[in-house]
């Protein structure tokens, strides 16, 4: 992932450890406090209740969708609802089988192991997970050379929760071992507005309903973006001595931050303008777009495209990406003129 993307206000990624700490303070602890994702919440409530009634560990859970939609938060909520401990890590952090063994060895019956970016697990680690997930054991090779021999190591029943922004990169054997698979969708403006108001209360910040809704409307359907914009708007409001924050203050702050009426920032607009100006809207190959706006192809696919596709400003074709008539109109142009 390009480091530059983490500096974007409208990026779904966590930009630094300070933001991670702030996110932690804003997180709900139980499903009843978790705003949005109603379908996912309802199904998880059923699965969790059933597992508790049977006194069994919850089936393994895969959460997938764009960054910033609350996958990590939901994993923590699941552990709280189950009343068990949770160990959190990420795919890149588990570099070798010994790292996985150390994590599994710390689990007690019913505990949750959460692996973020699970699509980035090394292949040798992923293969060790198969027996751990399916039959709750791992085989460890002890010794070296002629004396090396496998040792059967039983594990307590546990729940693996994997999170990914790239579900298509998961191997079929790993994906098939998740009994519960839930897609995290973009949030509605109404749900995001409730999140903004809840966060404002935690920040001890007054904001009116119109102001909260305007932040929600420009937050790209993403709670992390909504909270990040709220923090920056709070700065502008405090310097201006304005309380409560109203829609005029929100408009002023977001104009200064170059976040437009649809939640696009200067990089989104640069991407669209390049395609319109140099290729009459496309089709344009992903590698060409990446080279001209100075980003990696994976960053464009994961960070920029999903929202532009979601709001209908961009479409994918077999020959490349194309700007839609709505995308032309947003940039103040007509597709018929190109």
From Swiss-Prot:
GO terms for molecular function: ATP binding; ATP hydrolysis activity; four-way junction DNA binding; four-way junction helicase activity. Residues 188-258 are annotated as: Small ATPAse domain (RuvB-S). Its main location: cytoplasm. Its EC number is 3.6.4.-. InterPro entries: AAA+_ATPase (IPR003593), AAA_lid_4 (IPR041445), DNA_helicase_Holl-junc_RuvB (IPR004605), P-loop_NTPase (IPR027417), RuvB-like_N (IPR008824), RuvB_C (IPR008823), WH-like_DNA-bd_sf (IPR036388), WH_DNA-bd_sf (IPR036390). DNA binds at residues 316, 321. Residues 261-338 are annotated as: Head domain (RuvB-H). GO terms for cellular component: cytoplasm; Holliday junction resolvase complex. One of its GO terms (biological process) is DNA recombination. It is an enzyme of class 3 (hydrolase). It catalyses: ATP + H2O = ADP + phosphate + H(+). Residues 4-187 are annotated as: Large ATPase domain (RuvB-L). Keywords: ATP-binding, Cytoplasm, DNA damage, DNA recombination, DNA repair, DNA-binding, Hydrolase, Nucleotide-binding. ATP binds at residues 26-27, 68, 71-73, 134-136, 177, 187, 224. It holds the Pfam family RuvB_C. It is found in: Cytoplasm. Mg(2+) binds at residue 72. Has 3 domains, the large (RuvB-L) and small ATPase (RuvB-S) domains and the C-terminal head (RuvB-H) domain. The head domain binds DNA, while the ATPase domains jointly bind ATP, ADP or are empty depending on the state of the subunit in the translocation cycle. During a single DNA translocation step the structure of each domain remains the same, but their relative positions change. Belongs to the RuvB family. Homohexamer. Forms an RuvA(8)-RuvB(12)-Holliday junction (HJ) complex. HJ DNA is sandwiched between 2 RuvA tetramers; dsDNA enters through RuvA and exits via RuvB. An RuvB hexamer assembles on each DNA strand where it exits the tetramer. Each RuvB hexamer is contacted by two RuvA subunits (via domain III) on 2 adjacent RuvB subunits; this complex drives branch migration. In the full resolvosome a probable DNA-RuvA(4)-RuvB(12)-RuvC(2) complex forms which resolves the HJ. The RuvA-RuvB-RuvC complex processes Holliday junction (HJ) DNA during genetic recombination and DNA repair, while the RuvA-RuvB complex plays an important role in the rescue of blocked DNA replication forks via replication fork reversal (RFR). RuvA specifically binds to HJ cruciform DNA, conferring on it an open structure. The RuvB hexamer acts as an ATP-dependent pump, pulling dsDNA into and through the RuvAB complex. RuvB forms 2 homohexamers on either side of HJ DNA bound by 1 or 2 RuvA tetramers; 4 subunits per hexamer contact DNA at a time. This is Holliday junction branch migration complex subunit RuvB. The gene is ruvB.
